[in-house]
């Protein structure tokens, strides 16, 4: 808890306006770092909901955050500073060996319910949740599109409706890729028109298994892509696949906290959970 707080507090202070985003001179006694750290302890406690996490933090060490507000006020503060957790991800340094111009691109379904409830589900439908089809069949919800380094450090992510094509999701993330880079992708990104468009406009070469004829190179492609599966399994282990949010903002803030925790552990700024 102490290590996590010190890490997040230092990252916030290193931002240009870290912790100083309020327009008034009224600074709450409970800092933004404290608000974020309590939520990030969800990965440590392996709890399903933020409320369980909040109660466990208070029960295990009530003196750690003496000015922590009540749960509802804390949750409202968390949603207001949610953009801070997204900004923090860009301040986590990359290891030198990770910056080699080779990227992994993939998407991950964020399901709102089990398939048996598809006929009557309404959760977050007005916020964009919709039916999509992935490698494991149909689902109702959103897609988390992720770009990472070859070694598995997340560079950028975006949350879209479940029916958004993987290639359209990749277009939103192209600014994270360097020119003359190579993106290793699955068959959901194949298509000569798409690949030619991305190469001509951004100078990034998308390579799928369908583009490779040599059997040995196909094995290398599959081996490299296992890293992105590791990313999603680590996010799943942090309960990123369990949705209890009742708004798009709440869902996105929760996913950002999972990714922030993953990035800190991957960068060895925190011990692996």
Q: Language-model segments: which ranges?
A:
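Short alpha-helical elements
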Residues: 1-273
């Amino acid at each position: 808890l102490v290590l996590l707080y010190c890490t997040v507090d230092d990252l916030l202070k290193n931002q240009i306006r870290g912790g100083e985003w309020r327009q008034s001179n009224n600074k709450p006694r409970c800092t933004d770092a404290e608000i974020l750290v309590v939520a990030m302890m969800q990965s440590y406690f392996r709890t399903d909901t933020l409320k369980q996490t909040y109660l466990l933090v208070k029960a295990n060490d009530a003196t750690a955050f003496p000015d922590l507000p009540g749960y509802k006020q804390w949750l409202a503060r968390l949603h207001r500073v949610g953009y801070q957790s997204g900004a923090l991800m860009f301040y986590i340094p990359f290891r030198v060996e990770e910056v080699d111009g080779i990227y992994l691109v993939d998407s991950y379904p964020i399901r709102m319910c089990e398939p048996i409830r598809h006929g009557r589900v309404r959760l977050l439908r007005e916020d964009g949740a919709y039916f999509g089809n992935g490698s494991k069949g149909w689902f109702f919800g959103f897609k988390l599109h992720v770009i990472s380094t070859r070694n598995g450090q997340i560079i950028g992510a975006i949350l879209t409706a479940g029916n958004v094509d993987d290639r359209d999701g990749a277009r939103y993330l192209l600014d994270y890729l360097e020119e003359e880079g190579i993106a290793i992708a699955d068959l959901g990104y194949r298509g000569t028109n798409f690949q030619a468009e991305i190469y001509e406009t951004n100078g990034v070469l998308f390579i799928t298994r369908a583009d490779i004829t040599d059997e040995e190179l196909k094995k290398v492609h599959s081996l490299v892509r296992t890293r992105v599966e590791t990313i999603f399994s680590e996010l799943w282990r942090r309960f990123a696949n369990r949705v209890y949010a009742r708004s798009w903002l709440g869902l996105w803030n929760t996913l950002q906290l999972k990714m922030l925790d993953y990035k800190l552990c991957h960068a060895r700024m925190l011990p692996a959970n």
